[in-house]
Curated annotation (Swiss-Prot):
Pathway: Cofactor biosynthesis; riboflavin biosynthesis; 2-hydroxy-3-oxobutyl phosphate from D-ribulose 5-phosphate: step 1/1. It holds the Pfam family DHBP_synthase. D-ribulose 5-phosphate binds at R37, E38, D42, R150, A151, G152, H153, T154, E174. The lineage of its organism: Bacteria, Pseudomonadati, Pseudomonadota, Gammaproteobacteria, Enterobacterales. Its cofactor is Mg(2+); Mn(2+). Binds 2 divalent metal cations per subunit. Magnesium or manganese. The record marks H136, E174 as: Essential for catalytic activity. It is an enzyme of class 4 (lyase). This is 3,4-dihydroxy-2-butanone 4-phosphate synthase. It comes from Wigglesworthia glossinidia brevipalpis. PANTHER family: 3,4-DIHYDROXY-2-BUTANONE 4-PHOSPHATE SYNTHASE (PTHR21327:SF38), GTP CYCLOHYDROLASE II-RELATED (PTHR21327). InterPro entries: DHBP_synth_RibB-like_a/b_dom, DHBP_synthase_RibB. Keywords: Lyase, Magnesium, Manganese, Metal-binding, Riboflavin biosynthesis. Catalyzes the conversion of D-ribulose 5-phosphate to formate and 3,4-dihydroxy-2-butanone 4-phosphate.
């Protein structure tokens, strides 16, 4: 990672604090993972306060695959089985079956419809019957041990929203360049300046846990 590029956002602890404040205010953040892993940057929003305009931004500048990151307990409550019985993907990304709200939407594709689906899924009293399967929102089940057990964007989204005092559920979407390639750190930082989103890396969250503990 180019630490010089990140330095304008503060040290690791400050970068996490900035991210938590942004999530509390209802704004998005940008999280990069290790360059030896996916080496990609994701937009992350807190599921409970994400807006239609923010969803439109994620769809327009992201991969189009919008995921909601949930705890294992929430996935169990919603009866969301894993997408496949044997996960042989490179990073064992824990996709469940895709979902759609059972009410209040049309085709489920629009930014508005996807927000309705997300709000439906994270309701405190949400039931399995509140969601249709398959759909256009892709749940990801976070590792129960969080970022300290699996250093992925899924765990970052759940851990950061929890640390921010919000429901432990985040919406993520990978950022892409105009030519269809994946955005790396230089492009992510340019994107952050344009849309006023703080930047941090996965390792910052691990350092933050060490700091507060």
């Amino acid at each position: 990672m180019n630490k010089k590029l990140l330095s304008e956002f503060g040290d690791p602890v400050q970068r996490v604090k900035n991210a938590l404040q942004s999530l509390k205010r209802g704004n998005g953040i940008l999280v990069l993972d290790d360059e030896n892993r996916e080496n990609e940057g994701d937009m992350i929003f807190a599921a409970e306060n994400m807006t239609v305009n923010q969803m439109a931004l994620a769809i327009r500048f992201g991969s189009g695959i919008v995921c909601i990151c949930l705890t294992k307990e929430k996935c169990k409550i919603l009866n969301l089985p894993m997408m496949v019985k044997k996960n042989n993907s490179k990073y064992k990304t824990a996709f469940t079956v895709s979902i759609e709200s059972a009410y209040g939407i049309t085709t489920g594709v629009s930014a508005y419809d996807r927000i309705i689906t997300i709000k439906t899924a994270i309701k405190d009293n949400a039931k399995p019957d509140d969601l249709n399967r398959p759909g256009h929102v892709f749940p990801l089940q976070a590792h129960p041990g969080g970022i300290l057990s699996r250093a992925g964007h899924t765990e970052a989204a759940v851990d950061l929203t929890k640390l921010a005092g919000l429901k432990p559920a985040g919406v993520i979407c990978e950022v892409m360049n105009d030519d269809g390639s994946m955005a790396r750190m230089p492009e992510i930082i340019n994107f952050s300046k344009k849309y006023n989103m703080p930047v941090l890396i996965i390792k910052d969250i691990i350092e933050y846990y060490n700091f507060i503990n």
